[in-house]
Amino acid sequence: IEEFLREFNGEGIQHIALICDDLVACWDKLKANSVPFMTAPPETYYAMLHERLPGHGQPVDELKTRGILLDGTTEGGEPRLLLQIFAQAQVGPVFFEFIQRKGDYKDGFGEGNFKALFESMERDQVERGVLKVEEKV
């Protein structure tokens, strides 16, 4: 956001979101046409998906291979999901977001992914010994 504000001297359109019926197939077509995507989250993000969204029913290996994020809810046994991926900025700091909504997912814009990404990066750092977990006494 900071880069955008600096580049354009204020507010404006930061990104453009496009909805897809099949985000995995969409990603494959975009990648075949050399669209660059933002760096995929660490392995731990995908390892934590079943904890965060039990019973989500999505092909984690396909999501992980492509760096696709998954958010939503599985409460009541009916997954309501948002799949999302971000292309690298190609028009100044403006970037494209590609999404797919599944079930009756109408609310939200992937807010749960912000927390999940942070937690997965932290877990990855702990596993690599870069970050030490302090024990509470």
Task: Place the predicted regions along the sequence by residue.
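Glyoxalase I/VOC metalloenzyme domain signal
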Residues: 1-137
